């Protein structure tokens, strides 16, 4: 019996090892012990709780018509939907203490899923004007709005000190970054350049902000941007990574890759930025995005993942030991995006 038990354990370990090995792509020296946490559907933007024990993410799965918000343990267990199942949701985050969560939703405008954007004008992102930011208990109950202004309010994240939320809004006619207290008060505009600024995160000390920006310069580019925004659309073909102080001062362009670079996040020491980009793709028209890292001064660009499809939305755990990201690797079918977690190796 002991011998059979040994054989069973050996085979089980071999299967787990084979699964882990199948998730690793040659050249990914910073990632170890990669584990797949979701299996099937579209799962992305997974972010750690402040204690590093849970993840909150958006998912279109099962019979859902569009994304809803879920939480789970960092081993993939105990998956629970915490949004109300109405409208479309995006960009969720835990508040400090883990008892509250925030996310953006369109449900107060319409309870049905909003239509997908019109791709006849090329690849575009929809800027749904019904998006507002809500706070709820971590079990999804007691939903309350944090924003109520006309137009798009979304892409909210929370400072590590737990005091501030940064988000993107078109309340003043353009897509700019704003900060506010976690109760929705003391709203402050941080960016003022025409174009899109969004996807922002605070540095570990809460003193800096990293974000993606796309700023048209020629008259033709500005006209096209404004025309599309009037239709609640943007073209996400070129984003650069930027940083600024938490009060909006000292804006600095970090990347100059002329590519779609987004989802930036500071390393635990605050000296580098990990982000997603199609800069390394041989054909940037295809969905080949990888994780990359760069120093905050724009030097030392390093490729982190080498998967030939999509790797994106990276976030370090609060202790800096793990990295969570979304990827098309090991997809059961075309279009599946899943959440993965890995040990981070310097």
Q: Where are each of the predicted segments found?
A:
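Blade/loop signatures of beta-propeller domains
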Residues: 19-32, 131
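Beta-strand-rich domains and repeat architectures in extracellular enzymes and scaffolds
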Residues: 22, 33-65
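A flexible loop/linker signature enriched in serine peptidases of the S9 family
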Residues: 39-42, 59-68, 84-88, 104-132, ...
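Residue-level detector of Asp-centered blade-edge/turn motifs that repeat once per structural unit
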Residues: 50-51, 96-97, 160-161, 204-205, ...
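Hydrophobic beta-strand positions that form the internal "hydrophobic ladder"
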Residues: 55-56, 101, 165, 209, ...
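Blade-loop segments of beta-propeller domains
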Residues: 67-105
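Short loop/turn segments that connect beta-strands within beta-propeller blades
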Residues: 73-77, 137-141, 181-185, 245-249, ...
